[in-house]
Amino acid sequence: MRVVFLGLSITSSWGNGHATTYRGLVRELARRGHQVTFLERDVEWYRSNRDMPEPEGCETLLYSTLDELRAEHAARVRDADVVVVGSYVPQGVAVGAWACDTARGLVAFYDIDTPVTLAKLARGDYEYLTPALVARYGLYLSFTGGPTLRRLEREFGSPMARALYCSVDPALYFPEDVPARYDLGYMGTYSDDRQPTVDR
């Protein structure tokens, strides 16, 4: 399959947890024989902090403006079997609507921030997604599973919401034979809204 991602950033993990998820995902898609292109908005804060300018498993192409994205990459998006638009993409509503209008294949939304996204939608903050756009995506991939998926379908009109959880990159993280020091461990991204629960 030809897969095109329009994501926040894959070239810089600076203040951006999305990069780690995308890097492992595209590498594994390529390993399975898929052709992957990642389209990334070239913004100064990531440009100044690129820790992986050429990620393994995909062709990474940068664009500076929405007009440049449309002019330079319409054929890639149109001809892709799957187009995946990620959460927090700059001008995400316009990018998502353009992808839905342009692509002939499936257009999916990959929400790496589902609780944040739902809170933003509830307060009318449409930074990268609107309720109407949820219904236009053929597939809604969410870091959150369970009843949230049904809510995305019933309340927001997603034709198909499925979990695609954050994953551990097995090339970087794997079991090792070391003595156990703890009975229980927790590894997660720090977030002010989750920390009180973790501290209990």
At which residue positions do the language-model features occur?
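Conserved catalytic-core segment of nucleotide-activated headgroup transferases in glycan assembly
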Residues: 21, 27, 151, 167-200
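Extended catalytic core of nucleotide-activated donor transferases of GT-like folds
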Residues: 15, 22-27, 37-156, 172
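Nucleotide-activated donor-dependent transferases that construct or modify glycoconjugates
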Residues: 1-15
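Short hydrophobic/aromatic-enriched beta-strand-loop microsegments
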Residues: 159-166
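Short hydrophobic "strand-cap" motifs at the C-terminus of beta-strands
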Residues: 6, 143, 187-189
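Residues that mark the start of a beta-strand
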Residues: 2-5, 104, 181-183
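Cofactor-binding loop segments of dinucleotide-utilizing enzymes, especially the Rossmann-like FAD-
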Residues: 8, 41, 112, 166, ...
